[in-house]
Amino acid sequence: MMILGNLRVATLSDGYGLIPDAAILIEGGRIQWVGPEAHLPPSAAPRHDMGGRLCTPALIDCHTHAVFAGTRAAEFEMRLKGASYAEVAAAGGGIVSTVTATRAASADELLAASLPRIDAMLAGGVGTVEIKSGYGLDIETELRMLRVARRIGELRKVRVRTSFLGAHAVPPDYRGRPDAYLAEVVLPALKVAQDEGLVDAVDGFCEGIAFSPAQIAHLFAQAHKLRLPVKLHAEQLSNLGGAALAARHDALSADHLEYLDAEGVAALAAAGTVAVLLPGAFYALRETQAPPVAALRAAGVPMAVATDLNPGTSPLGALGLAMNMACTLFRLTPEEALAGTTIHAARALGLSDTGRIAPGFRADLAIWEAEHPAELSWRIGPAPLHARLHEGEFV
């Protein structure tokens, strides 16, 4: 048991939910009480004076591809010199290069490559991170990626949620045969992953260059049979009705959404599905059509913000910078950006015990060298993190 005193607490209970001169009572890894310190119930718990600093829930990065091998720096240079997508692919670049490197990496090598990325996230105030598979595209490597993700959660003071993304792309050995790939690789791998307790949700990529709505619907039906929630990469490059499809399947989230239309917005609102905005990919791909934030806001769709950390289209590992990008590029307010990396990000992962500072919630907290929550989205550069607590313990 302990008390954090002399804080400015953003509870995220109503907007920022800001409480000046606040205290938090923590016991058993959970928040027992929060409010003005003058009203703190009598307690013999040791008190830590936090010097008037800002306290928020630890941040949640709800969409990452943080486990992979290799880099895509060479094709980054190629694109800047004018190479087309086809030319990059012909030179061995694109997702195939990451798949090749990831398949060749052992579990230990994948872990060694991934831990520094996770450590950088934690230094930015992240306390929960989602990690997807999707760079194996064969049964063995997809499972290896998920095992490495679980191992990260054991080695670091971070809560890891895994998403099975076997339906990320059709590998070269199944080119032109996506249905066979789903039947022979994706669904068998999913069953093994579920049997081993490796998967928390099932994801897919609904796009002309990936999988059709009918194929995703089949995948989701199988996921539901395994009692697994679903989420979807949707409307990133075109509109195939992926968001509405996700909503029909009670998806936790639909992610990207640059080409989301009014029908999709209405479907997300009706289903309570979270819209996950990924400004890093929008920036890296130099897209020009942004997600319809005003329409999502008007419809009451909860909006989350994540890094989409991946080697090809969003090599962004700083959630604070993603918050700034969401405000600058997508016109979110700083309040929306903070909610998008706390309470709404938790909802996008199906978590109901984190993302707010309230009695009964996990004591996953971030203490910042800041006076006001808007500073977290305003800053560009190193995160002003002073300290982080994971289940009520300083880390």
Swiss-Prot record:
4-imidazolone-5-propanoate binds at residues 72, 135, 168, 236, 313. Keywords: Cytoplasm, Histidine metabolism, Hydrolase, Iron, Metal-binding, Zinc. Pathway: Amino-acid degradation; L-histidine degradation into L-glutamate; N-formimidoyl-L-glutamate from L-histidine: step 3/3. The keyword DNA repair does not apply. Signal peptide: none annotated. It is found in: Cytoplasm. It holds the Pfam family Amidohydro_1. One of its GO terms (molecular function) is iron ion binding. Binds 1 zinc or iron ion per subunit. It catalyses: 4-imidazolone-5-propanoate + H2O = N-formimidoyl-L-glutamate. Its main location: cytoplasm. It is an enzyme of class 3 (hydrolase). N-formimidoyl-L-glutamate binds at residues 135, 310, 312. Its EC number is 3.5.2.7. GO terms for biological process: L-histidine catabolic process to glutamate and formamide; L-histidine catabolic process to glutamate and formate. Zn(2+) binds at residues 63, 65, 233, 308. Its cofactor is Zn(2+); Fe(3+). Catalyzes the hydrolytic cleavage of the carbon-nitrogen bond in imidazolone-5-propanoate to yield N-formimidoyl-L-glutamate. It is the third step in the universal histidine degradation pathway. Belongs to the metallo-dependent hydrolases superfamily. HutI family. PANTHER family: IMIDAZOLONEPROPIONASE, IMIDAZOLONEPROPIONASE-RELATED. This is Imidazolonepropionase. The gene is hutI.
